[in-house]
Every structure is written in structure tokens, then in C-alpha cells.
Amino acid sequence: MNLQEYVLNKAKKAKDTSRKFSSSSETDKIRILNYISEELMANKNYIISENQKDVESAKNTGMSSSLLDRLLLNQERITKMAEGVQKVAQLQSSVGNISQMWKRPNGLMIGKMVVPLGVIAIIYESRPNVTVDAAALCIKSGNCVVLRGGSEAIHSNNALVKIIHQAIERAGFSKDIVQFIEITDRKAVDELMKLYEYIDVLIPRGGPSLIKNTVENSMIPVIQTGAGNCHVYVDRQADLEKALKIVENAKISRPSVCNAAEKLLVHKDIAEEFLPKIYTLFEKKVELRGCEKTLKIIPQMKAAQEEDWSTEYLDYIMAVKIVDSTEEAINHINKYSTKHSEAIITENYTIAQKFLNEIDSAAVYVNASTRFTDGEEFGFGAEMGISTQKLHVRGPIGINELTTTKYIILGNGQVR
């Protein structure tokens, strides 16, 4: 079987299975997810041993420490994955709900029913937890899924899919619900993107080049999960102690993830007081790159270049800019943002409302860290990614975002 036939076969199996699985009961889907959670806990040592193969290989290729952190699985993270599957199992699914029903003058009853999308493909990079999250969310929402992870996590993903398949078959269902493309050749992705007859939606989750390639070349409808060039703006009426805690968390709690803050904007009226505190807080932890005005206050900083304002670092680097007004901060963010997550720190209600109304991003915060843009933190159990587009879904993609609707019409012999 050549590469083209291999990928096509995976997609066909998912499509064929989806017709039956889409009508599975909620009880059955919960049972599958409970078994997945149990199997993850029972196979921790196996998962870790396979993950270590990926980690060692990544170290040998010079992968950065922040990206290695994305790849790493340990006892604690596997437990968290298993708990996440349990949370997804307990979520209230909208599949099968009739959200509206109305009667026409001719007696027809017309309703709108929530149904699964069908077959979802997801292309992702070095985070093996996505394998479990994606499978769990698709199963809960009645979808079949085609997984294509990155080559750097191939051993981890193979192990996780094997465990997921064991759980599905233990529950009495076909393992074809979850398909995994083991071929790491990028040509497999090219073939996958052509299969619009079998796959209903494609979700790319990774770096800018992966997303750009998918959006430009996929024949399948795409839900775009964008990069996270996230901003924190500290207003002139901010509580500075609160601001310090939020900026610290947003930047260094986990810099390799898409909801980490990459840019810090500071109002000119508080810059001379606030910036030295930030510099002291981040000294030897974060490389700060400042605008011209910032360098006058903290000359030890590295000078920011134009490309810094649009760069998602995913590392211990942050660019800092002093702004004259909230209006300037909003304009700067809307110009350079990837439309992911932005935050304002202020005690002024009017300014906060202006920021909420005028920032054009998927998640906009007042006095909280951007790190909360996450399916679990939003109460979704997990997420397929963070959508930065506006059509179909925006923000964390949970189970209800993996559905569509169809009309059901009840008649009594009406003709037109």
C-alpha cells in the first residue's frame, strides 16, 4: 500500500464508522471515555518509556528547553490527562438536542437539531497530550477523528493511540472511531488535505508554518487555531502589585504555550515606577526587549526591533513598549496581535469596557492572566485548540463547537 492509499484508507474507515457512531448513546460514549481514563492510569510506565524515546531524540536534535517541556510526559501529566478525559465524560453534550421548534401556518413543525460534524482531522506538532484531548472530545461529541501528530512525538502518540484503541474495543466499539496516521512524511499531510469527500473539517494545531500551509492548501474546510502573540497592557490606573503578579504568571508560568504573554504595554504615566519592578522581577529569568522610550528608563534592556512586535517567542523573551494612551495600546494590539488573547490591568471601569469592546481577539481579559485561555479553565474539560478565526467557532474548541445543526420537519401529509 503506497502513501496515498494508506491515508485514503484511514479516512474511509473513519467516514464509514462515523455513520453508526454519530447516533451512539450518551451512556456508550461515557463508558468509552471512562475506559480510556482507566487505561491511561494503568499504562503510565509504558507511556513514559515511549515518551522518553521522543525526548532523547529531541535533545539530540537541539530542541529548546521550552519546546521539550511541551513534549515531556511524566506521572503527573498522565494523571492530569486521565482526569481531563473524566471531565470530558461528565460534560453535558448538546448532541441530539432540539434547540428550536416552531409551527408554520400550514401545520408543519420545524425544528433545529444539534448533530456531530462527522469526521474531524487534526494535524498537530510536539504535544502528545493533544492525542488524548482530541480523541476524547471527538468521542464525546459523536465524531470520528483522524489524528496526525508530529514526527518528534511519534513514539508517544503511537503508545497513546494503542491505549485508546484498547479502551474503545473494551467498550465494545470499533477502534476505527480513532484513526492515527503513523507516517511522518509531510506528504501524508498533503494527501490528507485533499480528502474532502471523507473528512468534514480539518484543524491544524501548531506553529505558523503548519497553519499557513493548511489554510492555503486544504480542500477541506479548516478551523484555524492561530499562534499566540498575546499582550498585557498595564493602564495608568492599574494596581501595580496586581499587575506584577499577572505579568509574571502570563509570561513565565509556561512560556512555550500559545496563551503565554509575549508583549507588555505600559502607560507612560506609570512606566518609571512599574518598569524597574518588572526588570527586577524578570532579571536572569526573561530577556526583555524594549522600545526607545523603555530603554531610556532601563538602558540595560536589549533594543526591540520591528519584527519583535509580531513574533510569538514561545520562550523566556518579552518585548516591552511604553504607550501614551489606552487608544494607542488598543491600536498597537489590533495591529500586531494574532487575535488570540489580550489583557488589560486597570481599576478604571470605563477604560476596561473600552478595551473589552475594541480589542479584536478571541479572548479579552480584565485584571487576569492570558494563561486562562484554555478548554479546561473555561470548563470545557479540554480543547481541540484555540480558534482565532470568526466563522463557526472562536476561542477554545470544546465538544459543543464540534457540532453543527440540521433541520427536522414534521408533517402530516403537507405538499407544496
Curated annotation (Swiss-Prot):
Family note: Belongs to the gamma-glutamyl phosphate reductase family.
Taxonomic path: Bacteria, Thermotogati, Thermotogota, Thermotogae, Petrotogales
EC number: 1.2.1.41
Pathway listed: Amino-acid biosynthesis; L-proline biosynthesis; L-glutamate 5-semialdehyde from L-glutamate: step 2/2
Keyword Amino-acid biosynthesis in annotation: yes
SUPFAM superfamilies, per database record: ALDH-like (SSF53720)
One Pfam family from the record: Aldedh
Source organism of the structure: Petrotoga mobilis (strain DSM 10674 / SJ95)
Cellular component GO terms, alphabetical: cytoplasm
Record's keyword terms, sorted: Amino-acid biosynthesis, Cytoplasm, NADP, Oxidoreductase, Proline biosynthesis
Function, in words: Catalyzes the NADPH-dependent reduction of L-glutamate 5-phosphate into L-glutamate 5-semialdehyde and phosphate. The product spontaneously undergoes cyclization to form 1-pyrroline-5-carboxylate.
GO MF entries: glutamate-5-semialdehyde dehydrogenase activity; NADP binding
PROSITE patterns to which the protein is assigned, alphabetical: PROA
Catalytic activity reported: L-glutamate 5-semialdehyde + phosphate + NADP(+) = L-glutamyl 5-phosphate + NADPH + H(+)
Superkingdom classification of source: Bacteria
Protein name: Gamma-glutamyl phosphate reductase
Subcellular location: Cytoplasm
GO biological process: L-proline biosynthetic process
